[in-house]
Amino acid sequence: MIFVLLLGAFAVTSCSGRRQELDAALSAAGSNRPELEKVLAHYRSDPDRRKLKAAEYLISGMSGHYGLVPSPGLDSVKAVLADLYARRKVDSARLEQWRHFRPDNLKKAYDIETITADYLIRNIDMAFEDWDCRSWNRHLDFGEFCELLLPYRVGDEPLEDWRTEYREHFRYITDSVYTGSDPVELVNTVFDTIIDSLFRYNVDFALPSLGGLWLMRNRIGGCRESCDFAVYLLRSIGVPVATDCYFHGSTHTWNVVLDTTGRYEPFWMDKFTGSRAVRGRDDGRVKGKVYRWNYGMSGRSEDRTPRYIDVTSDYFGPNAARVRISRECRGGPVYLGFFQYRELIPQTAVNVHAGHAEFRDIEPGVAFVPISGNGRIAGSPFYIDDSGETVLLEPDLSHSEDATADRKTRATPWLQKTMDNCEGALIEGSSTPDFPEPVPLGVCGKPRINYNYIYPSSTKPVRYVRFTPREPLRMELGELRLFRDKERQDTIDVVLHSYSEPNRNDALAGNAIDGDELTYYEGRPGPSFLVLDLGREEHVRCIEWVPRNDDNFIRYGDTYELQYLDGVRGWRTVEGSRVTARDTVLHFSGVPGDALLRLHDMTRGVEEGVFIVEDGGQRFL
């Protein structure tokens, strides 16, 4: 792996430095320099000197910002997404045709060479209107204004007049729905007001920034698209917001609003998995390190866009961990390694002093390990505890303990919320498909694991079995299996009879009986059902139901082994730990004390989190 994730920030510390940046930007503009000079001349005659400073800020930081030029391929992908948004499904061949589209080869139109004076002036004037006229912005200083309200773009989208369009479309919210002065409450009012038209989650394609005008009409995409939409909307009505993210494995983004208290409060405007802004609370995801997209900061790539700053301390406060580095790795910088499944993802780089490295501002309760530039483990794994102390995880082979394990990775709040959609679901039988007198077979309890069982008390044979989620919960069912015996040795073969319409092309009803516990059937919002045909009347004595899940619980028949990290010597297998699962909980003995562990599935999958033994069970870090 080539480690290129060097995230940092620079600050302009003098007027001469800002002047040099401005001169450099004007020189880089080439034939477009007159447009930028026109902006500066316009504001030199404006009595509000802040506007000239804002113009200088935007122009000074403009180098490296660009929009990707639309292409026939990108237009085709956007057309497929628009159809998915409008009709919820699209021809699978058409979907597959564009699934492998990549935006990497799209041409770039650099702002410094193409932006017009009229566009920039209109953007600056509208941003200042919102700074000066919105009561919740009285606390904003100039630097916060420049990053949270002023920017004319959010990514690599084409330049367009999104601010005017969004203000006209959504100003009714601040005109009549919410007229207070609390930005957090305003964000939640927007969330509640437009929730029925919020984002439909779709990550079928690799996408560049799609632009505010397209997202206004087509609210579909992944977390980045929903965050872009939220920034366009909220900045257009004067709310100071930004986009935060983490970089490990699958990158996730969300939004933050600057409260009048000076705190940044997280939220995410997604219809089903989103979250309102709640002071002092985030979404519970493990972050490790957190970064914020800024217009005027140095970036991770050669052309300095997109640009990120480290804001981890906004979430967890300041802290530091000082750890010893092996002699072989002291010749250069070392990286903060984040455990992402079987890889170590570098988060930030520090220099080694007196044989030690000090990593600042990291999430407490999360395991890290120092690594060299070529990915070599450079020291012992560690974490910061709740008191701010650094805890080293060095295996004690002279002291062993017993341990149980029921998962490969930590259970996230999203996972539990998804599984809970099965809680209270009603399972009924009937001799006919219209269920005139349904036979109660059971009700699903609150799922804590993947495999769940119901043993019907009814002795009446049935030919059809119906699964109905409890309203207002939605259908999210991984598997439904029926048995003639309580020991689950005699499976009843079933076929689909009828079902409510699926919500997505890849979440069809057949997934609930395909034998693959990672696929699932997802119904549309509102009442839904699934009816299975047993072919003939049968006595159903056991029902196995599997909620939609991440397939990281213990899986019957898979072979596992327990491993521990022995510092720079790498991962080692706990002696005698290899076992084939016959239950949903695995039991191990002879586990080294104080060790960082992982449960390795030798049969399938790559998602394996790290944990320690606590009270005989797993505590994921």
Regions found by a protein language model. Give the residues of each.
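Short amphipathic beta-strand segments in non-cytosolic proteins
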Residues: 332-351, 426-443, 550, 556, ...
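Hydrophobic/aromatic-rich core segments of domains that either
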Residues: 21-23, 27, 45, 177-181, ...
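Disordered, acidic Ser/Thr/Pro-rich linker "stalks" and the adjacent N-terminal cap
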Residues: 401-451, 457-461, 472-540, 546-555, ...
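Short Pro-Gly-centered beta-turn/loop motif in secreted/extracellular proteins
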Residues: 356-367, 373-375, 459-461, 590-593
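Structured interaction patches on ligand/partner-binding surfaces of diverse proteins
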Residues: 374-400, 482, 609-621
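C-terminal motif of bacterial Sec signal peptides marking the signal peptidase cleavage site
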Residues: 13-14
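A short, amphipathic beta-strand motif
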Residues: 318-328, 411-412
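Secondary-structure boundary elements
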Residues: 37-38, 46-218
